[in-house]
Swiss-Prot record:
Its EC number is 3.6.1.12. It catalyses: dCTP + H2O = dCMP + diphosphate + H(+). This is dCTP pyrophosphatase. One of its GO terms (molecular function) is dCTP diphosphatase activity. The gene is 56.
Length: 171
């Protein structure tokens, strides 16, 4: 489980991240593709140093991909629980923060009604980092299927258009 501000200290590097983002745009690169590449390289590194980690470029069979996807889903589930807990203000400690999703806790209603914009900047940042943690594993799913940013955009565009059409037609 997450610990208070486990990732919040990373914000000290935000200037470097901002400069990197502007450099990526200045080089006319796609930020999503850069993130996919970064995640792929991390997974390759893990596969090279830990024999039990899958190499994303060596997923050859449907079974390999099923195993890869299940691992990513398990990780997403774990990170999602951390995200929910962080919405209960990690500055209170993990046990107290979990009241936001544990209906049997005395502080449940209070935690549920707390406005995000009234939380400390550190608590708000922890929430965002937990969502980014989930995004890592979503990126891994795309990487495992060998998808690039252009393909993701095209398929997303088509599916989003279809979803609007469905809504227009009483879906």
């Amino acid at each position: 489980m997450a610990h208070f501000n486990e990732c919040a200290h990373l914000i000290e590097g935000v200037d470097k991240a901002q400069n990197e983002y502007w450099d990526i745009l200045g080089d006319e690169k796609d930020p999503l593709q850069v993130m996919l590449d970064m995640q792929r390289f991390l997974q390759i590194r893990l596969a090279n140093v830990r024999e039990y980690c899958y190499h994303p470029d060596k997923l050859e069979t449907a079974g390999d991909v099923v195993s890869w996807m299940r691992e990513q889903k398990d990780c997403i589930d774990d990170e999602f629980r951390e995200l929910l807990t962080s919405l209960g203000e990690m500055s209170r400690g993990e046990k107290e923060a979990s009241a936001v999703w544990k209906k049997w806790k005395a502080r449940y209603i209070e935690a549920q009604e707390k406005r995000i914009d009234e939380m400390s900047p550190e608590d708000q940042l922890e929430i965002k980092f937990e969502l980014v943690d989930i995004f890592h594993f979503v990126l891994n799913m795309f990487v495992g299927l060998g998808m690039n940013a252009e393909e993701i955009f095209k398929l997303y565009y088509l599916k989003n258009k279809h979803n609007f059409e469905r809504q227009d037609n009483g879906y």
